[in-house]
Amino acid sequence: MMSSQRALGRAILYLSIGCGVVGISELNMRAALAADYKEAPSLAKEVAAGKLPPVAQRLPANPLVVKPVDSIGSYGGTWRQALVGASDGLLERTIGYTRLVRWDPKWTGVVPDVAESYSVNDDGTVYTFKLRKGIRWSDGTPFTADDILFWYNDILMNKEITPAVPRWLRSGNDPVVVSKVDDSTIQFNFKSPNGMLLYYLASNIGSDILAGSPAHYLKTFHKAYNPDVDQLVKAAGAPSWVALIQAKVGNWQSPDRWRDAARPVLDPWKLTVPYTGTTQVVAERNPYYFKVDPEGHQLPYIDRVTYDVMGDVQSVILKATNGGLDMQAQRLNSLETGMVLAAHREQGSYKLFKVQPAWSNGMLICLNQTVKNPVLRQVFQNKDFRIGLSLAINRDEINDILYAGQSRPYQAVPRPGTALYDEKLATQYTQFDVKAANEALDRTGFTKRDDQGYRIGPDGKRIAFSIDVQTARKDHIDALELIRKYWKAVGVDMQPKPIEASFAVARMLANDQEGLVWIGGGGYDFLGLLDPKWYFPYENQSAFGSAWGIHYQNPKDPNAEEPPAWAKKQQDLYTELLRTVSDEGKLALMRQILAITGEEFPVIGTDMDPDNYGVVKTNFHNVPDIMPDTAFYVTPGPTNPEQYFIK
C-alpha cells in the first residue's frame, strides 16, 4: 500500500483557503529556457520542412515539467497494447488522462494540469482556475477560457445535449455557473459549498469537460453555430444533430469520443486510426503537447501508441505472454492471470509491476434490508442474523482455495495504509467460529428448525433466500458455493443465483434482489469519499438497502423508503462532508460514517482483494513498480505515460 496515503491532503495538495493559490511546486520545476527546448526528431523534420512552427512556439509560456520516475528518456518507438471489443475503456486510461487538475502519481492529492494554478474561497463556493497561456489543441488552435465557456453554455447547459446536469456540478437543483475572468482564467461558482469538486475533476468523470471544449471543432456539429448541420447528420447516418454531437463529445462511461480521429485533444497522443472495434487503433504524438521533462524535452518520449482489438481477454493474455504487449495492466489484472504472467516472464521478455486493487473487499455479501419480501426484510434487518452468518464463514479456506493464500479475512472498510483504515472494523466478526455463529443466530429468536436442520423464520417457514452473483465472476460463484455449505451448517438455506452482470444491476436498481455479492469499492481514501455506497445507503446500488439509498438521492422516487435513524445519520454526515472544503474535515466526517458502519454491520465482507500485476517489457522504462488500480484513479494515467520511454 502506498505509505503516503496517510498524507492525504498534505503531500502534493497545496490547497490554501481564501486568497491562497495552489502552486505547481516540484512537479512543475522551472522549465528550461525557450531556446533550449528540445523535440522529437520526427517533429524537427516537420519544422525544417515548414510544416510545423518551432517547438518554443508550440509550447505554452509555462509548460508543465514532469519529473521522470527513474531517468530522462529518449525519443522514439511504439507502445503496443491490446483491448477487447468495441467498448473498452483503455484509451481513456492510457492516452486520455488530461484534466484541468489531476491526481498526483502516488494518489495523495490533486495537482494542476491544464490549469496552471487554482484557488478556492473560504466556503468552497468559488473555484478559480488559471489556464496555461499559449497552450494549444493538437491541431494548433489556441486553447482559452472561451473553450471552457463553450462546454458550459453549449454542451452542459443545452438541455437537448445534456438533459440533466450531473450531481457533482450542482448545488442541490442549481447547476454550477461557469464564468470567464479573462482569456486564461475561469471560475466555477456554486450556490452552496462544494468540497468535492477537485476530486471529481481529477477522476474519470473529469474528462468530460475538456472533451466538450474544442469549440472551433464542435461548433461545426452544433445547430446553434452551423445552420447546415443536417447535411453532416445525414452523411454520418446519425438520427439527429444532438446524437451526432453527443457522440463527438462522448462521456467518461463510453468510448464514443475515441471513434473520431479528427477530434482535437490536449493529450500526449492524438488518434490517427480511430476506435471502430475492429483490427487496430493508432495514436501518434501530439506536436503541441504542453509538457516537458526537466531538461526541456517536449513530451511524450514515445512516438506512437497502438491498440490491437482482440475478441476476448484470453487473447490479450496470450499476446502478453508472447511478448506482444509493451506495458499494460488492464485485462491482465486478476490473480489467476498474474500466475500465468509470472510463469512466462522469460519467454515474453517482460517484468511484472504491481497494481494494487482499490477495493475494500474481494467479495461483499449484501442482504437487501429493503427487500420486497416482508419476512426476509425482518430477517435481514436483524443485526445478529448478519453477525451470525459472518462468523459462520471459513475465510481462511476461501483464501486458500480461491486466492492461493494471497488474501486475508477482511470486512468492508478502507485498506491498510490509508488514512481511513480501522483495524477493529476490518477484523470484526471475521473469525471462523461455528459455536459463536449459532449463538448469534439464536439471539435473533429463530431457534426452531425443520426436519432438515434449517431455521424457521417469523412466518413459520424455513429461512431461505437467493443471492445474485455475476456469471462472469467464477471466483465469486465458487466462493458462494462454499458459503452455502457454511451457512447450511448453522441452519440457513442460501442458494447462489448466477446471473449476467447487466441483469444483476437491473435487479438491484429495481430493488428486486434478495441478496447480492459484488466487489467492494471505497478501499482508498479518495474512493471512500467519492464512492461510499458500501458504507451507507448512498444510492440505489447500495445493495444492502437499495430503497434507503434511493431516498437519499431522491425522496420523491416511488421506490424510495425512509431510512432508519442510523442510516439517516450517515446520510446527514455525508451531506455535510460534501460541503466541507478541508481534507482533514472530510476525513473526520468519513470516520464518523465508518464508525456507524462498524456498529450497524450492514454488509458482510469476506477477504481482501489480493494484489494484481501488469506486464512491462524489459526495454520499456519509467513505469512505477506499484500503482493503484481503479477507474477513479484512471490507472495508469496519473503515472504520466508521456514520460515512459523505450530503449
Residue map of PLM features:
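Extracellular/periplasmic solute-recognition and catalytic clefts
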Residues: 151, 159-165, 178-179, 272-282, ...
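A structural "hinge/loop" feature
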Residues: 70-94, 114, 197-206, 376-378, ...
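Ligand-site clamp/hinge motif
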Residues: 132, 255-260, 288-340, 484, ...
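Aromatic- and charge-enriched surface segment that lines or borders ligand/interaction sites
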Residues: 116-162, 181, 187-189, 319, ...
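Detector for C-terminal structural segments
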Residues: 64, 263, 269-281, 285, ...
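Surface-exposed binding/hinge segments that line
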Residues: 167-249, 626
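N-terminal lobe/hinge region of extracytoplasmic solute-binding protein
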Residues: 39, 45-122, 153
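A bilobed periplasmic-binding-protein/Venus flytrap-type ligand-binding module shared by bacterial periplasmic
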Residues: 104, 286-288, 321, 360-384, ...
